[in-house]
């Protein structure tokens, strides 16, 4: 099921159709030294994220996300079944779970978690390791930066595309 949201941003109103697995990245916040913030669209008009102030993963409406974080870009895997699997994993591993917020190395360990790790791990469990370049070599990151999901080179290399590329 797709959701159509009318988003009003900088006096422009545009319609955006969200699909499961869409990665929302905002620059409207920063926490624990990480600039930016991520959420993953899980279907039915809902986004899953974990903000520092809330301490545990939470679910909110896309409408509330856009209101809270007006400067948001959206990326999507070119393979829609991968997006579906990742969204289902976000629900399975994080929705309603009392996993404390903390930025720690190794995104495969989710005893503690943070916003971009939730997105990374959900895709990892769907069979996709989102890689970033380190000294010219593409590797899984030790700490996942929120902006990795909107860096043009990273997005392209990992088989994602921009659905909304405007802050």
Model-assigned labels for residue ranges:
Residues 74-135:
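Active-site nucleophile-His-acid catalytic modules used for acyl/amide transfer and hydrolysis
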Residues 110-167:
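Activation targets extended, charge/polar-rich intrinsically disordered C-terminal tails
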Residues 59-80, 84-88, 142-157, 163-167:
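Intrinsically disordered, low-complexity, charged/polar segments
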Residues 10, 37, 54-55, 135, ...:
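Histidine (H) residue identity feature
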Residues 1-12:
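Sec-dependent N-terminal signal peptides of Gram-positive bacterial secreted proteins and lipoproteins
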Residues 17-77, 100-110:
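Glycine-rich catalytic cores of cysteine/serine-nucleophile enzymes that process amide/ester linkages
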Residues 9-11, 35, 86, 115:
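Generic detector of short, well-ordered, non-transmembrane alpha-helical segments enriched
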